[in-house]
Amino acid sequence: MALDFLAGCAGGVAGVIVGHPFDIVKVRLQVQSTEKPQYRGTLHCFQSIIKQESVLGLYKGLGSPLMGLTFINALVFGVQGNTLRALGQDSPLNQFLAGAAAGAIQCVICCPMELAKTRLQLQAVGPARTYKGSLDCLVQIYRHEGLRGINRGMVSTLLRETPSFGVYFLTYDVMTRAMGCEPGDRLLVPKLLLAGGTSGITSWLSTYPMDVVKSRLQADGLQGTPRYRGIVDCMRQSYQAEGWQVFTRGLASTLLRAFPVNAATFATVTVVLTYTRGEEAQVDSEAALGTSPTPAGSALAQPSSL
């Protein structure tokens, strides 16, 4: 169990490192003004960040997701597995419900973590920097705004994470069963990578508009007076000013990120288990990832993609 958890965390770290540049592009595209847009699109945003801030600019705010990774994976694994066992039957509906429960519980850590990440990604470079790092960011927010400030965007995070994790685990379960992911299959790892990457894409598509709202609420007031009074007001103002397209802003970079992040996660989990458990790695990697050898087998699971 301990090695399964370690492998999941290692896979999550790999996923964060691969996906963080795409995430920072997504956030900047989501929150930029339409009146004076700084970036023309995903590629231009990448180029501008590297030109103005170097490659390191693509890893602003990396500490925050890495900091919360262990706890988030522990919650996701524990809650999803225990909920599925409590429900008693490994059915598609229960996969969705167990995943949704895991998504909801991990918001306690995910929300403050993403708040710090968003603030760090959007702050100026050089002497004008407000925060020295993820921890300093959260400390300053707490001093000025209290616990309410730390939990800014919690409701929108819950509305995003709860259904998206349900869709995530459901898609992964359906795909691994459909492809026949059996222990000993020489194509097992590619199949798991395909299932994980596709699951990441479908989960993002299911709740992406709420992610835009969440990013705007967490960035609100960073450069002046707050604009939004809440989720509904943010949606209304955003729609009136920019049309429905605003709720798909940054989607391209997010989907580009989703597949390789999950591919990196699954590959790392497999490698870690291979080197730590030798001949048992193939079976253990199935257990850690929750792959069921038969339709009535154990629950499917994977580390959080962040």
Swiss-Prot record:
SUPFAM superfamilies named among the record's database cross-references: Mitochondrial carrier (SSF103506)
Gene3D superfamilies named in the record: Mitochondrial carrier domain (1.50.40.10)
GO cellular component: mitochondrial inner membrane; mitochondrion
Alphabetical UniProt keywords: Amino-acid transport, Membrane, Mitochondrion, Mitochondrion inner membrane, Repeat, Transmembrane, Transmembrane helix, Transport
Localization per Swiss-Prot or TrEMBL: Mitochondrion inner membrane
Annotated Polar residues bias: 291-306
Pfam families (alphabetical): Mito_carr
Solcar repeats: 2-86, 90-178, 190-275
The keyword Isomerase appears for this protein: no
Record family assignment: Belongs to the mitochondrial carrier (TC 2.A.29) family.
Species this chain originates from: Mus musculus
The encoding gene: Slc25a29
Biological process terms in GO annotation: L-arginine transmembrane transport; L-histidine transmembrane transport; L-lysine transmembrane transport; mitochondrial L-ornithine transmembrane transport; O-acyl-L-carnitine transmembrane transport; ornithine transport
Molecular-function annotations in GO: basic amino acid transmembrane transporter activity; high-affinity L-arginine transmembrane transporter activity; high-affinity lysine transmembrane transporter activity; O-acyl-L-carnitine transmembrane transporter activity
Record protein name field: Mitochondrial basic amino acids transporter
Substrates-to-products reaction catalysed: L-lysine(out) + L-arginine(in) = L-lysine(in) + L-arginine(out); L-histidine(out) + L-arginine(in) = L-histidine(in) + L-arginine(out); L-ornithine(in) + L-arginine(out) = L-ornithine(out) + L-arginine(in); L-homoarginine(in) + L-arginine(out) = L-homoarginine(out) + L-arginine(in)
